[in-house]
């Protein structure tokens, strides 16, 4: 009890600076291994500038170490000038949990410890109550309005004497975005990270005195220019691993290879746009779009800042007198040959040349698509993509589609690109939509029902639009209770390909022209000729049940609630269709549920690519066997007809064989 009372008294009487240092030390001891902490100290102190007894980093040092562009006009208009944006974020996060008083913080060792813990999601080891998302904290670090001038330490200064004296006075004004707007003694329930930090220090009273209720955050905005530069960085380095050199991702870029990245960024920005970009992005729009449509967009920050936990000066794998290269040299060699902007490493060798899928599209998909659990990001969880079908390579026919897609018994991603049927087909009118199908496509005559594990997002389907606007419709949690005429996927030679549509009842009339119709908040229909498609979205106010939830776009966000049901149907003249199989290369604890259809015929083949090839080999052997049987039927026409009739009755040829 004595220790508890002592801590309590210390917490109440300590200044924000002291409490901030205590939290940093607690983060350092709980969230890093001793080896990581040693590497971090070596990196920070070996490159640090010095002002008196204070060692710190400025923007130039931070950008150079992370390997990100800082004031680089190489690619024009500064769209890759992410250094100032990252430095702004870090200066804000380094003041956690006292952003009002201490931000922007000087990037000392204590500040950088907190930054790394927050940006790499390690705070759960200390802050048990903290939310898994950091959206509000990240918004505050990016907001442009009301910031005070940064510390006198500037990135443009060259000598220690000219760097300016770092100050950490608690009576200075911090970011005005964090200034309390009233004097109430309660606090914002959204600040769980801050509250958890202060509770761990027994310093709630300090928090109440320092911040109170923060309402101005809801009035602040992020400029589109700032957000564009950050998005460009994320699109380029999305595949980054902790052991890779960031500079390799930029050294291979040129103006031509950056065009897809810029196009991708513009499409994402459109989902935040409510008509006037000069006002920037407000908090409610930011929170709505990020949480519903871009939940993994900030994931590249984790490997980027984990670079600080590896020091080249302390590389224990070096062998001075060895004739073989070190582990780090092997990693570097692997990294340099592994990444190529023109052919992303996530695509497995042997796949067809993609017309839709490129590095920018893969990065875009990784911002929202969950393909595994507990690590959802497809670029961080070992996911590889295998080319299953391409209309450009395999032809525009449902026969070819069924041959390639229905024999794939693992999750898949469908991509469709084309032009708006009501436009002239200019580049601005190019439309790309798609869907994530977590279970195998079923045969047309299949009567089995699918069951989806709603506890994991990777087990739910997803419908999305990538261009000219980003929109995501996640699978409904009530998907298993939908009626049988609302399947996730329907495939038929008569009605085409339907995703999230309402399927009409079967009819005996050969002239029946009924086709799947839109349902719920989103659907995609492709006609049997694979020439046209219809992409449907609604704001969900019609309350019609369906496979997908409403899209998270700005114009239908809670901050701009529509007064009535709204929907949008885009008619697409198709250019290309691609289906990419999802292959998990990382070991998973549980056996994959996608083996049942081929396990009896081909044995328990663990790899989806091998299982598909085994299916094709089996079909080829059966075709050869049928051909030999047909050739062995001798005699005249009557005997040939009798033999054919026997084969049809046995189900080897004819309609019954096709339905098997």
From Swiss-Prot:
Residues 355-583 form the TLDc domain. The keyword Cytoplasm applies. Residues 150-187 are annotated as: Disordered. The keyword Cytoplasm applies. Signal peptide: none annotated. It comes from the Eukaryota. GO terms for cellular component: cytoplasm. Belongs to the RTC5 family. May be involved in a process influencing telomere capping. This is Restriction of telomere capping protein 5. It comes from Trichophyton verrucosum (strain HKI 0517).
């Amino acid at each position: 009890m004595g220790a508890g009372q002592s801590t309590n008294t210390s917490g109440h009487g300590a200044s924000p600076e002291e409490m901030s240092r205590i939290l940093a030390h607690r983060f350092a001891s709980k969230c890093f291994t001793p080896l990581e902490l040693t590497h971090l100290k070596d990196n920070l102190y070996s490159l640090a500038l010095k002002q008196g007894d204070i060692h710190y980093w400025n923007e130039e040092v931070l950008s150079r170490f992370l390997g990100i562009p800082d004031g680089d006009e190489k690619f024009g208009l500064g769209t890759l000038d992410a250094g100032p944006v990252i430095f702004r974020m870090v200066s804000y996060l380094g003041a956690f949990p006292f952003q009002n008083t201490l931000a922007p913080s000087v990037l000392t060792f204590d500040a950088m410890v907190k930054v790394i813990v927050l940006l790499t999601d390690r705070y759960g080891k200390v802050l048990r109550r903290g939310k898994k998302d950091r959206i509000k904290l990240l918004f505050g670090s990016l907001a442009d309005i009301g910031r005070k001038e940064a510390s006198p330490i500037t990135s443009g200064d060259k000598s220690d004497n000219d760097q300016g004296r770092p100050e950490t006075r608690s009576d200075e004004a911090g970011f005005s975005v964090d200034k309390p707007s009233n004097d109430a003694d309660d606090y914002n329930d959204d600040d769980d990270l801050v509250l958890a930090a202060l509770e761990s220090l027994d310093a709630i009273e300090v928090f109440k005195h320092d911040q109170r209720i923060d309402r101005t955050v809801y009035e602040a905005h992020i400029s589109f220019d700032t957000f564009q530069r950050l998005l460009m960085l994320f699109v380029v380095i999305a595949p980054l691993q902790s052991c890779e050199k960031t500079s390799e991702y930029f050294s291979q870029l040129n103006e031509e290879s950056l065009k897809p990245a810029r196009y991708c960024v513009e499409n994402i920005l459109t989902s935040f746009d409510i008509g006037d970009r000069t006002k920037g992005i407000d908090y409610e729009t930011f929170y709505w779009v990020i949480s519903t449509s871009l939940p993994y967009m900030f994931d590249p920050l984790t490997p980027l800042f984990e670079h600080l936990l590896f020091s080249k000066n302390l590389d224990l794998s070096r062998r001075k007198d060895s004739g073989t290269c070190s582990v780090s040299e092997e990693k570097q060699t692997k990294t340099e040959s592994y990444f190529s902007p023109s052919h992303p490493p996530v695509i497995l060798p042997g796949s067809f040349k993609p017309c839709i899928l490129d590095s920018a599209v893969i990065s875009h998909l990784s911002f929202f698509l969950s393909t595994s659990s507990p690590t959802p990001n497809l670029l961080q969880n070992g996911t590889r993509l295998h080319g299953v079908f391409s209309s450009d390579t395999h032809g525009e026919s449902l026969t070819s589609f069924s041959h390639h897609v229905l024999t794939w018994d693992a999750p898949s991603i469908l991509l469709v690109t084309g032009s708006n049927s009501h436009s002239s087909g200019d580049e601005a009118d190019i439309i790309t939509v798609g869907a994530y199908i977590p279970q195998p496509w079923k045969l047309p005559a299949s009567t089995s029902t699918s069951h989806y594990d709603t506890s994991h997002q990777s087990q739910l389907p997803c419908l999305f639009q990538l261009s000219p606007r980003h929109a995501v419709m996640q699978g409904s949690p009530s998907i298993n209770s939908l009626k049988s005429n609302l399947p996730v996927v329907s495939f038929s030679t008569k009605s085409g390909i339907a995703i999230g549509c309402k399927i009409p009842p079967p009819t005996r009339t050969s002239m029946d022209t009924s086709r799947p119709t839109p349902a719920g908040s989103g659907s995609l229909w492709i006609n049997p000729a694979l020439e046209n498609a219809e992409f449907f979205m609604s704001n969900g106010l019609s309350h019609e049940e369906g496979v997908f939830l409403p899209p998270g776009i700005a114009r239908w966000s809670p901050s701009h609630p529509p007064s009535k049901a709204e929907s949008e149907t885009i008619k697409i003249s198709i250019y290309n269709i691609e289906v990419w199989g999802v292959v998990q290369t990382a070991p998973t604890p549980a056996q994959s549920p996608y083996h049942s259809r081929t396990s009896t015929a081909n044995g328990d083949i663990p790899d989806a690519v091998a299982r598909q090839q085994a299916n094709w080999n089996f079909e080829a052997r059966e075709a050869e066997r049928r051909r030999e049987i047909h050739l062995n039927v001798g005699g005249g026409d009557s005997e040939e007809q009798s033999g054919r009739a026997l084969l049809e009755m046995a189900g080897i040829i004819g309609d019954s064989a096709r339905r098997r």
